[in-house]
């Protein structure tokens, strides 16, 4: 075979490989939103305008063997792209079918079977620029795997996760259960363990919600116990009222306790959401005391925010 034929066949093979590698199509989704927020008390003060700045690239398909494959990449301005996976933020690959369940590999931005449940009943209202640190949880996020078992019984979801650590980082494993077999009721339990050299930490979450008529009630508690260091506990509850198909009102409260501190961080918020003609307007007022476990004025912070999002 002469060199010209070899070059031609090599180019054809490369073209076929490239074609098969990019056989799936990716779609792009974003959101149109604008808002204003105002902080007072401890931390940063003043008003700030905001707008949606996140794009999600996603694609999916099915192999000849009947395995569903989906891929997701998120571009989020200002998020932690400095970890080396930039320009992307969260990104994951998902494999699933009815008999094998669902396996998710997260290169960044994943959750453990415990941390996926540890969002507080009030909706993590601490995470509003008030100066409150993120509560501790079982390690996950980068280079982690989450497996959701196929259905074992009606209305029961079982998940398991593992993060191998690496480069001296902690390894972690977790398991979680959610049962929704009673009308209006959902109950979840998650437990995770994080191991580093000479230290071990356990995180557990229990939470539940119950919808009755126009009301929804929620409770949650997460405990983080560590061999060396201070233990953490977060307790939360919420009450939501659906006024109509368009309008809802929610009140939520959280208490963050840390071993070694006599002052708890306490957060409460009231919010409302109204939807009409493809536009959703939301407003919230949030108040915190004991920020950074400080007493008096030094530990007080407030925020109000208003936002509008558009579906089209």
Role assignments for model-derived ranges:
Residues 1-312:
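Outer-membrane beta-barrel proteins
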